Amino acid sequence: MIENLICIKENDLVQWVCGASNILVSMPFLDSAMVDSTRQLVFALSQPKPLPTVLTIFNAQGEKLFWSAPPEGSIFYYLTFNLSKEVVVVCSYAEKQNGWHDWFYSWNMKNNALSRSGPAY
């Protein structure tokens, strides 16, 4: 179980405890991170220019499972939870997509891809 997530931005580190192990991951230009307790994952946004340009997902043991730039035409905005208590990333588009600028994207573990799950408002 992932516990005690700490973002140490000045040192570009994300740290957490998993069981008896202290996990420390280097994240250049760290912006933010959140724990997905439902799936036992750590989501991290990094490399802000000025908003984050990289999403990285780690398992509880600190192994990188997924890395992505934002979907085409969008920027990563922030991390939050959906109604299922899973971490999702909000992506913002300069031009409205189906009437909305901001959309929730979730990580599909089976397909190893981000998928748009609904408008963020």
Positions of predicted regions on the chain:
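Histidine-/acidic-rich catalytic cores in large beta-rich domains
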Residues: M1-W16, I57, T80, S84-V88, ...
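Short, structured interface segments that constitute the first stable element of a domain
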Residues: G19-T56, V88-V90
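Repeated scaffold domains used in trafficking and secretory/extracellular systems
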Residues: I2, V25-R39, P70-L83, G118-Y121
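Short, compact, well-ordered microdomains
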Residues: F76-E86, S92-G118
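Short beta-strand elements that form the blades of beta-propeller/WD-repeat-like
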Residues: M1-K9, T38-K49, K85-N98
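Structural motif
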Residues: K9-V14, P50-T56, Q97-Y105
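Aromatic (tryptophan-biased) beta-strands that constitute blades/sheets of beta-rich domains
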Residues: V14-P28, E63-E72, S115-R116
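Structural recognition of the beta-propeller blade-terminating site
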Residues: F58-N59, N108
